[in-house]
């Protein structure tokens, strides 16, 4: 795994890459120089509606929270909210969520 060509976002191996995902990865080609990068994710179990949201930074700072009565979309947004709460006023956020 390296960086996507012409991008600062880590290269991921996909089984299938719809055009929307390809377009999504080109929203920002360059990070804000000198600012932290937060990698965020959230998900839940469709049946129990229990989930988790969290982030990890390049420096290894991390936070994970257990969620109840949530959806995948709410969990993804919660992870972004957590990163915004714990970061400085300027931050780079990387998410795999097309919804967020």
UniProtKB/Swiss-Prot annotation:
Keywords: Aspartyl protease, DNA integration, DNA recombination, Endonuclease, Eukaryotic host gene expression shutoff by virus, Eukaryotic host translation shutoff by virus, Host gene expression shutoff by virus, Host-virus interaction, Hydrolase, Multifunctional enzyme, Nuclease, Nucleotidyltransferase, Protease, RNA-directed DNA polymerase, Transferase. GO terms for molecular function: aspartic-type endopeptidase activity; RNA stem-loop binding; RNA-directed DNA polymerase activity; RNA-DNA hybrid ribonuclease activity. It holds the Pfam family RNase_H. Residues 32-100 form the RNase H type-1 domain. One of its GO terms (biological process) is symbiont-mediated suppression of host gene expression. InterPro entries: Rev_trsase/Diguanyl_cyclase, RNaseH-like_sf, RNaseH_domain, RNaseH_sf. This is an African green monkey isolate. PANTHER family: ENDOGENOUS RETROVIRUS GROUP K MEMBER POL PROTEIN, RNA-DIRECTED DNA POLYMERASE-RELATED. Belongs to the retroviral Pol polyprotein family. During replicative cycle of retroviruses, the reverse-transcribed viral DNA is integrated into the host chromosome by the viral integrase enzyme. RNase H activity is associated with the reverse transcriptase. This is Pol polyprotein. It comes from Simian immunodeficiency virus agm.vervet (isolate AGM266). The gene is pol.
């Amino acid at each position: 795994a390296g960086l996507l060509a012409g991008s600062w976002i880590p290269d991921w191996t996909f089984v299938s890459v719809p055009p929307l995902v390809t377009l999504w990865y080109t929203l920002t080609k360059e990070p804000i120089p000198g600012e932290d990068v937060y990698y965020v994710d959230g998900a839940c179990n469709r049946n129990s509606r229990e989930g988790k949201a969290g982030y990890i930074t390049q420096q290894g700072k991390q936070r994970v929270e257990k969620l109840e009565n949530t959806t995948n979309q709410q969990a993804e947004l919660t992870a972004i909210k957590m990163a915004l709460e714990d970061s400085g006023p300027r931050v780079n956020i990387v998410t795999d969520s097309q919804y967020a």
